[in-house]
């Protein structure tokens, strides 16, 4: 059985992000990828988002956080909306839409959110363009966030909290740490 992997290579990650921005421009698909990479939300939670979850129509600005009850765990979480996400969502012209509209609407079924399968196809198309291995899926966005946070020295306890994991073992498995990652630590530490 294959396991979904994070996107570890920065070069491939940049190619992956570039696909819907430059190669096959689509602001919705680009925003989906950027939001997934930068929030560590599960795709099931991303697809349930509405415009009002990210945009304050009274203040005419982005909300500071996405406040959500995770579908899988039932836990409440607050996710900061960083500049990358704000820029990607800005191209979607949210202010001209209804607050209750799906943030990532289906083009095929008007009024409905994007399906999980369609989100998978969007991600897979960008992954193929970037030359990524076959084990890339919707969950890779969430895992990629954790992997790169870990590489930037975010403490494992913080990642456990972000992911709402009950044990470090789950988080460790999630990050996809392999022998190459361990080798880099030994190469980097020179006492």
For each predicted feature, which ranges?
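Conserved catalytic core of the tyrosine transesterase superfamily
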Residues: 1-191
């Amino acid at each position: 059985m294959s396991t979904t992997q994070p996107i570890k290579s920065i070069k491939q990650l940049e190619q992956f992000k570039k696909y819907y921005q430059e190669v096959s421009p689509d602001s919705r698909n680009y925003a989906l990828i950027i939001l997934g990479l930068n929030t560590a939300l599960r795709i099931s939670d991303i697809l349930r988002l509405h415009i009002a979850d990210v945009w304050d129509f009274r203040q005419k600005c982005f909300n500071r956080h996405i406040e959500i009850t995770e579908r899988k765990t039932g836990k409440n979480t607050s996710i900061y909306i960083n500049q990358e996400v704000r820029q990607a969502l800005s191209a979607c012209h949210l202010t001209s839409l209804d607050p209750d509209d799906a943030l990532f609407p289906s083009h095929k079924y008007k009024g409905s959110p994007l399906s999980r399968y369609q989100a998978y196809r969007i991600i897979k198309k960008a992954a193929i363009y970037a030359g990524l291995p076959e084990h890339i899926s919707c969950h890779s966005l969430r895992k990629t966030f954790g992997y790169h946070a870990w590489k930037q020295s975010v403490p494992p306890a913080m990642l456990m909290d972000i992911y709402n994991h009950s044990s470090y073992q789950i988080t460790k498995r999630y990050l996809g740490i392999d022998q190459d990652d361990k080798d880099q630590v030994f190469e980097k530490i020179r006492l």
